[in-house]
Amino acid sequence: MMPLPAGVELEPLLAALKNLSWQAADILLAYARKPMELSVDKGGEGPVTAADLAVNKLLLDGLNSAFPAAPWALLSEETAAEQGSQIIESNEWLWILDPLDGTKDFIQGTGEYAVHLALVHQQRPVLGVVLLPEKQELWFGLLLDENCSAWCENRAGIKQQVQFSKRKELAELVLVASRNHRDQRLEQLLQQLEIGCSLTVGSVGCKVAAILRGDADIYVSLSAKSAPKHWDMAAPEAVLLAAGGGFSHADGKPLTYTSSSFLQAGCLIASHGISHPLLCERATKAMASIDPGFQV
């Protein structure tokens, strides 16, 4: 756990993040109701919409305006290609932003998309914000010296505490899985974990929120030809860890935000924490037979 950067106070920071988050929600909800105005670009590694770009500008401009002298840099999914890996290597404090996590779900109209904001110190998140516009949920996670806590609040500022389920046995656990990123190896792994049942939910932020609400207990990310990126994981990880849950590689090692390719490769497991060590042990053993040599 770490303090905030010099000259940055927690309460003004939280106020600014709340303001920016609900502005982002308004933008995304407006675009979601007018799909013909999305102007989708399918180039690169995934679809990018006008909504992505509008929220990206809001977040970058908003943080720069609210904290012009703060000793941090800003990295977002939409600017990573032009910024390059040096932004990670040369900054002790870094915001990692995803203006629209779950773009495919956003385009498909499932309502399962999120906005991620994570403040990272020396390659580890210390603050995370996950916004779910359609559910009007704003999740916060603080991993600070003076404050380690997580909560959810609505637009009116009414707070709700994390409510992990009490399910413990693997056969009781509820898996939250993606509808857009699944392959045969992942199906084999999930079968060997012998989880009770599953929910299909888009966006990493929405999946982790399902765990925080107690609707689900575990999420597994298994990289293949592609892998999730820093901006997919940083904010959800911060919120889940601050709540007392688990988020790690299957071998128990923590995620790090150092990769010059911005990749979070391997077998990543997020859970409500109760059964996390056993889940990691089972997953590591299973992957040794499913894909020998795979670095979990």
Feature-to-residue mapping (PLM):
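Residue-level signal for inorganic ion chemistry
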Residues: L28, D52, L63, T103, ...
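An extended, acidic
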Residues: Q163-V296
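Short, charged helix-to-loop "capping" segments that act as catalytic/coupling loops
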Residues: L63-E77, E82, L144-C148, D217-A235
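A short, compositionally biased
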Residues: P35, L142-S149, L241-A243, L263-Q264
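DPxDG-like acidic metal-binding loop motif
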Residues: Q86-G157
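Acidic active-site catalytic centers that drive phospho-/nucleotidyl reactions
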Residues: D52, E77, D98-D101, D105, ...
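N-terminal subdomain of lithium-sensitive/metallo-dependent phosphomonoesterases centered on the IMPase/IPPase/PAP
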Residues: M1-L100, Q188, S275, A288-V296
